[in-house]
Regions:
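Beta-rich carbohydrate-recognition and catalytic domains
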Residues: 1-107, 115-154
Length: 154
């Protein structure tokens, strides 16, 4: 296998599981044998969690998650974990605000990703905005998420 280089700060508490003996592909990562780690009905009104995006933050892990509600409509939820295996999912959807501090909630939001650039975290997701579009928000503290204008419109 080729050498893999990480371009990030060390994360000493990242959970790790050795490659399963029966795994015969050359990918640099493999699925955790206990997947899924978040079961059904993880928070009030949320039937399932999909497509999470997790970052280390202040000695623990924080993630943004597609929380599919019991009515089938997905929204973005925040979760925290000490070990990146056992998660506490907030019961409230992330309450996005615009740059003036006004509530600005996506109607239908799914498949979030989370990335840190310098001192700011950016959440990016797919959403319905008069058709399929990309949503984006920024946060310094992973508590307040400020929506940025949609970078790509339908």
């Amino acid at each position: 296998m080729s050498e893999v280089k990480m371009f990030s700060e060390p994360v000493p508490n990242v959970p790790w599981q050795d490659r399963p003996a029966n795994d015969n592909h050359d990918a640099p990562i493999w699925r955790y044998t206990e997947n899924p780690i978040i079961g059904r009905n993880p928070a009030k009104g949320v039937a399932r969690i999909f497509n999470s995006a997790v970052v280390p933050f202040e000695g623990k892990f924080v993630g943004v998650f597609r929380g599919e509600q019991v009515n089938g409509i997905p929204y973005i939820y925040l979760g925290e974990s000490e070990d990146a295996i056992h998660w506490n999912i907030n019961e409230e959807k992330i309450k996005f605000v615009d740059e003036n501090g006004e509530e600005f909630m996506p109607i239908y939001a799914y498949d979030p990703r989370l990335v840190k650039v310098e001192d700011t975290y950016y959440a990016i997701w797919c959403q319905d905005f008069y058709g399929a579009a990309i949503g984006i928000a920024k946060s310094k503290d992973l508590k307040t998420f400020v929506r940025i204008e949609n970078p790509f419109l339908p």
